[in-house]
Amino acid sequence: METMNTSETAARLRRAITRLNRKLRHSSLGGISPAQASMLESIEKRTNPSLGDLAVAEQMKPPSVTRIAQTMQEAGLIILVPDLEDRRCTRVQLSALGRKEIAAIRRRKTEFLEKKLLSLSGTDQHKANDLVAFLERLLEES
């Protein structure tokens, strides 16, 4: 029986996940930029974040986040609200359109994966299902 090189397997898994994530991001954008899509998801994960909070979360410079946020507000995806306690701070909320866009992004990602899975043989579809179960277990253990 051949001995598995776990280091090489881990590196291959990391590369495959990175490539899959990149493909999912590009397949799901619709009419918004990757930075806008990422910011929408960051806003959704946080309660009433400030632009500074988003700059940290997105690992971006504050002026870049401000510029993207202004574009997103103009598109109706978010609402910029002055902080009542600190007038220097601006808080960010998702608009109804922003929530719809997040749902559309997720739907497009799922459709992309579903299309890929449907192109596989039945045997490979079962292997993919087993792989998902494995990844879920792996993440639960972390």
List the model feature ranges, each with a label:
Residues M1-G31:
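N-terminal leader segment of winged-helix/HTH proteins
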Residues R12, A16-R19, L97, K127, ...:
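Charged, amphipathic alpha-helical oligomerization/scaffolding segments
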Residues I17, N21, I102, E136-L139:
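A structural signal for well-ordered alpha-helices, especially hydrophobic packing surfaces
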Residues Q70-D130:
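Charged, amphipathic alpha-helical coiled-coil/dimerization segments
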Residues H126-S142:
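Exposed, interaction-prone assembly regions rather than primary DNA-binding/catalytic cores
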